[in-house]
Amino acid sequence: MMKKIAILGSTGSIGTQTVDILPSIDAEVVALTTNRRINLLEEQARALHPKMVCAMDENAAKALKIKLADTDIEVLTGMDGLIACAAESGADIVVTAVVGMVGLLPTMAAIKAGKDIALANKETLVCAGGLVMSAAKQYGVRILPVDSEHSAIFQCVQAANGNPIDKILLTASGGPFFGKKIEEMRGMTREQALAHPNWSMGAKITIDSATMMNKGLELIEAMWLYDLPPEDIEIVVHRESIVHSAVEFADGAVIAQLGLPDMRLPIQLALTWPQRVPCKVPRMSLAEVAKLTFYAPDYEAFPALNLAKHAASLKGDRGAVLNGANEAAVGLFLNGKIGFTDIAERVAYALDTIPYKKDITLDDVLAADKAAREIVLG
């Protein structure tokens, strides 16, 4: 049966790779969105013929409407447009490939409309994991992870046959600054931080990989997806990015998922699950890989990890504060306003300054995010 797919953030890194794998699966695209990359969105829209498209930026949407005037594609804008593409486009499954907190409201709207979620926007679970997972259960929808690590864990968990898992082994590449001490990283430039050794990703997530905040965010995401306390999620640095993560069971057995670092495979699996279909990605040869290495992370050199672990242990609004502060600080770094090691320092200051709230609503999440950004940008 052909699936109807909405791709939120279709012009970004995950979005374009989602478009790349569409010929391999039986799918119809019903909605596409961008922030302001309307030339690429026009190209995608003319090729895929969606029912609706959205440019978050209002001026970009006006220009896009002119570009697509000869089609019957509805052009929307703003958060209302993004939510409409998620919830009102007729999609069976929504790929949430937008970056940052902007993904939360459309994801919740899609869940409440009964759409399955192919989740690439980790911030949604980091900020409001309890609310999102509760809503998914209430509305009977599946959250299918697109992150390579969480896709790996998802696949390993299938081997549990209903038995509980003891521990998640969450692998991390270590980023471009693996092995360096914090003093060595103080003067690191934007270009150095964006030089990831294994993965091709957007700028924000690449900086998060360099600070290792990305792995901290993924720890919180795993906590909510797999209902495990943070102390049962172990971060392991694995430089080759071949073992995408692993799960340990009660008897001590460990099952891992391996593959070359290519996001198209977990994207495709999220869209075809529980079926597997051929994927046009390079096949792995263990003989050519030859060696796999594993290390404990350096928590002193990468303080973002401890900040994330502390936020995970407290839950409540701490995930929203952590994420909002980090997004703002990464933006400052990318624009040359602060240094590399200032990112974690700004996040720590926000966590220390904003009063903790344990029992939260969606409005509390949005308020915590806003407060964190204001403090960092202050």
Region roles according to the model:
Residues 1-378:
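Catalytic, metal-anchored helix/loop core of enzyme active sites in primary metabolism
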